[in-house]
Amino acid sequence: MKFKYCLNESVKTTVQPKTKDELKKIIEDTIKEQGFNCDLNFIDTSLIKDMRDMFAESKFNGDISKWDVSKVENMRNMFAKSKFNGDISKWDVSKVENMSTMFAKSKFNGDISKWDVSNVEDMRYMFYKSNFNGDISKWDVLNIENMSHMFDESPLEGNEPDWYKD
């Protein structure tokens, strides 16, 4: 089967969606053709500002480690109820304002300790009922207006970072 976004059988071309809906369609097409563990790094996400619900309730667990998310402002519910547990440690999330329920009820437990979350205002229920147990003690959370229930029913409940205020 020839993959939709390939120049030939082994060389993927880069595609640059201009909208969230275009991005979602490319992801769905690729997963349908290659499975849930596919590599999505051929997608240039540098124009996308909203990734809300992008992988919510998905079985996707492939590679998106090289995605340029530097313009994204909304990651609400992005991986909620998903199986995703890939490497997103090098993502530039410095423009994100909303991370509420981003990993709620998800399998994610990757390293996000070096994320710049200084512009995030909403982290409520971010790790609610998730598997997350990472070290985020050095996050700059001065801008956060709402972090209620951020760690409820997660491994970090009772072991929250010092900066946490419910």
What are these regions (language model features)?
Residues K2-D166:
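Negatively charged
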